[in-house]
């Protein structure tokens, strides 16, 4: 087994060298994203900026071995696939890249197990993550000098069992956009726009930017900025993230951070902040935020 690990480590290093400093993420059209559900392992490339590819960190071979056992079971008898763990059946999250193929964003250990097992193809989900140039374009198109930031998964999306949610979309859209918005989000976003705020939503998860934008359109909720895949590490030696943060501060001297428990106002000019607690009642969450912002406007 140790010899196999060393062999894979060399293969991984060779694959990283093939793409490091060369690859460029490019947009994948809707047809490609809908039709491409599997791809060959030859078209998949490890992400040089992921810890999986760092020589001092690298793969967790215990995890890889667990996936290998499950993949071998599938190869031996496809009927056994129903007994395989959901994680093993989960598609790899990938981005289309130039010059060729797809960059793995999530699922390196499954990719490694598939390679070591000799699988020819593996399920994939193609996403268009927010790129640095997308953020520049959204900043240029934004119309206000104040912004509100919210976390998609922690604040905006609501699992019905956890609290009140907006009504599901009509068929067939409910089968495409499965996420439910928290009750009051469309009304809150409209209120924020009327009062001179650009709404920016963020997520560490690997959602396609256009998927999120279209989801909000279905609910008649406008957002100025969408940033997905924030868990990604910046390329080595890149100062772009710091530059974009500085540009954000220049564009928006005042920012409101909204979460489940409070509204926090941050003034980058005076370097001051103020916190406005919320009651925690999901039924009145959006109205309480409107009241907080209305109070700020009155104090001016």
Each model region followed by its residue ranges:
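Short alpha-helix boundary/capping and kink motifs at helix termini
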Residues: 11, 41-103
